[in-house]
């Protein structure tokens, strides 16, 4: 995600807009989950951290429990509101 996209993303999230989709550049294997993913639909509790990372909660497809994912801003390919 470029600087301009990040600033727009940050402004929208901080204004309370709900993120509906996040796509990463590479696949992530979540802890205790056997399904690598790079697309996350309906992430919850999206948080912009001070260290150029973004955290959000998703459902783990193996345990069916909520799990927090933290990624660097540069790992985000696209997003939707």
Segments the model singles out, each with a brief description of its role:
Residues 52-61:
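Basic/aromatic-rich interaction segments and small domains that mediate binding to polyanionic partners
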């Amino acid at each position: 995600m470029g600087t301009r996209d990040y600033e727009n993303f940050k402004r929208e999230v901080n204004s309370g807009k709900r993120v509906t989709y996040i796509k990463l550049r590479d696949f992530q294997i979540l802890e205790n989950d056997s399904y690598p993913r790079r697309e996350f639909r309906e992430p919850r509790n999206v948080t912009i951290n001070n260290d150029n990372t973004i955290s959000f909660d998703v459902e783990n497809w193996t345990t069916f429990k909520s799990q927090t994912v933290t990624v660097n801003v540069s790992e985000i390919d696209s997003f939707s509101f």
